[in-house]
Amino acid sequence: MEIKLFGKWDSETVAVKDPSLKSYISVAPVLVPHTAGRNSKKSFDKSKMNIVERLANKLMANQNNTGKKHETLAIVEEALTIIENRTKENPVQVLVDALENSGPREETTRISYGGIAFLQSVDVSPSRRLDTAFRNIALGASESAHKNKKTVAQCLADELIFASKADMQKSFAVKKKEEKERVAQSAR
């Protein structure tokens, strides 16, 4: 029996193009992406968690959706269905492409030397790249749905589609990534 995500999408054919993110993006086949916190005991076990569940967890981060995992999983499933209808591609592949395009490769850190503080450009670890990408995608979807006729699922689908195409004009996550990398480049 073949296990598909939500009984609809095959994650076996999903390819991660970025070699640095390969070991951190888990697209292991699961029926329902809900581990009930099994991967929260050790530091880097979140890299074993399915990326769809990590996206749902990030959507639960704001005040209104805290603890409503079933509701956020329904939002993610609806968004993936919208993506499949619009792009005619595997929506899990679109999610992976969006994560690759919206994670910053370098950012700045504050260094104090002799009482003078300045910014120094540093490379970003793959784990932090993914965390930042998830955060910005979820934030972009919830901000665009605020005071809008569109549902959160429609806004999440838009954000993922635009981020997978690396559209800086329409994607909040890609815009934030470019902004961080531009600041880091000026701090070299």
Curated annotation (Swiss-Prot):
- Specify the domain of life of the species encoding this protein: Archaea
> GO CC annotation: what is one?
small ribosomal subunit
Q: Keyword Ribonucleoprotein on this protein?
A: yes
Q: Which Pfam families match?
A: Ribosomal_S7 (PF00177)
Record keyword rRNA-binding present: yes
Q: What does this protein do?
A: One of the primary rRNA binding proteins, it binds directly to 16S rRNA where it nucleates assembly of the head domain of the 30S subunit. Is located at the subunit interface close to the decoding center.
Q: Which HAMAP family match?
A: Ribosomal_uS7_A
Its name, as the record gives it, is Small ribosomal subunit protein uS7
